[in-house]
Amino acid sequence: MVRVHKTYSEVVNTITHTAPHHADEVFATAMLSVLFPVELYRTRDQNIINNTDTIVYDVGGEFDPVRKRFDHHQKGFSEVRPDGIIYASAGLIWREYGMEIVKKLGEAKGVDNEMALEVASYVDNALIRGIDARDNGQGEKGDSMSVSSVISSYNALWDEDEDADSCFVSACNIASIILEREVKIAISSIRGQKLIKEQIEVTKGAVIIMDKFIGGWL
């Protein structure tokens, strides 16, 4: 659940910036909503940001996981993936909370720490790094629609009677669907790989026979 508050109060447990929204903080919000009901306040007021102990992301000019600060816009920010893709708020939140999120979403499949680490890495590579790349100007340019552009399309239109915060929540709902599906795909793929590997190890000959179709493991 994501609820956006018009004023700051002690109920607020997360802070990000005001409209317009981008895919990185929308997905960060969707991630956190897996773990707890998100009571969000959108602001750029540095005084509020400096004096809160809530999770702050994509705003505030500070990266410090211990203090629950996850911005990437500040001078000197140096969190970069091995392939050169710079972290944005989606990636920073995922790196901090991804395994916990995966274990929550994969509880019914018995996801343990080892698999959660694999799944978190899979989802980062398949989904989140692309969101971060586009937010940081490292993404592909062109006319094709991306996950990031779909999320951006939910910003309020100037000639429609739309509330920016309601549009933000709608975008978060879309992001949640995409994120949860990607986690399920990752779990399915990794479980499939392990089943295939186990069958190969006990099979003599060049052909393995499975008792059910296992797709999406390549």
Model-derived regions: residue spans:
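Glycine-rich, Lys/Arg-enriched anion-binding loops that position phosphate/diphosphate groups
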Residues: 123, 134-218
